[in-house]
């Protein structure tokens, strides 16, 4: 009887015990705090000649507080949502246009991206101008006047943990003609490549580093092998943020070597630099210096250069007024390949080869002050700045008919710039801009550029239609020329040819038919002004372009 009583008693209280046990298992209270973190972008710089509207890459991450529960057979894993999980890939972009006078343009980009593995892309760019021109006698010339730029390349990156292994290959080709005289063909190009491994220096809470190697080969396509040149380079950087302090170190090597006619050209550059920065609520600054050992084999100039570095800006909550100060320096190589890409009408002669082999590189020290800001949440933005530049071994281009050569001297300039942008409503924006060279040290050397330019633009930017009109004015230009006279020291004497100031009017309209197709039209230099590339090389007719864009 006693045993039966115990059994009945257990059966009676069992439901209450089980209920308490269930409540004990499910009564789990954990805090869950979703946060939206700063966007993390790939350190991929798009190389596009077309003005493609790039959309920002946004990465959202929801991170709960750390906890672990036994309600499930597996531990709870924090949710992670990335932009790439929902973004539709755009593997193909193509653009083609033709215009009158006869002009052609084309761009092609193929790409693929995997958020866990990496990316790959290939591209091709083309620009050609086949219009008739005018020679030195003022006669119209229709043959041997074409100009063309072509570029092909590829880039790929592999994610290795939090870092990226990246390879970049590209080749350029330029075609010109000396149409002011006999129409001689000018053809040259360059193949280049780069491989790098490291971080993108956006998250400095941990040590970031980057190591890379680069190389290129320049080929003179007319006198094959006479003015060829190669470059090799390597660099390494490390950086870390400690609290609000940033530390960065970098070292590098850059060498250039000529062949045949340029066999005496050898340039070896070694560099080392350091940066220290501080970021606070009101002030951001980065200060440092770079040392360069720049040895040009045929030059007698000192190879030692030290460049200061300073970036400082003051912040406020409204962002309506943000002043800044910048100081830096730069070493610009004056090798034959660099000169040809700057001015393709340089005449390659034995004298030029000898001069280039002994030509020191240009050094410049620059200081900039200014202020900018935006008001009304981006309704109005502006920027005003002044730049003082002190350069040594600066190259001044001078012409002799259809050919160009260079003379070096020191150059001191003061430039003032202003820009303002107004967005009264979401789809409209208006822009005005102006720049002036307020001072330059020389009266007998001329920089072949306007002393001032001003411009204004109006744009309408909606999802279906984009349209714009711009009007620019550039002042008269003094083009440096070689005089028949010589100085008392037997040095060449220079003069100038002055060309008038020019107004240029441009109009563009684009209609997006659907998500894949768009058509556009552009009017360039509708005023028919003489727009000079260099003295005696110009275009003076209005241009019209019709094109189509396709995105897959």
Please report, for each region that a protein language model flagged, where it lies by residue.
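Outer-membrane beta-barrel translocator/receptor signature
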Residues: 74-78, 85-94, 98-136, 144-152, ...
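Solvent-exposed loop/turn segments connecting transmembrane beta-strands
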Residues: 95-107, 116, 144-148, 222-228, ...
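Strand-connecting loop/turn motifs
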Residues: 89, 115-119, 158-164, 204-206, ...
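Sec-dependent N-terminal signal peptides
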Residues: 4-13
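Transmembrane beta-strand segments that form the barrel wall of outer-membrane beta-barrel proteins
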Residues: 88-100, 106, 124-128, 171-173, ...
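Flexible loop and strand-edge segments within Gram-negative outer membrane beta-barrel domains
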Residues: 129-153, 157, 165-208, 212-231, ...
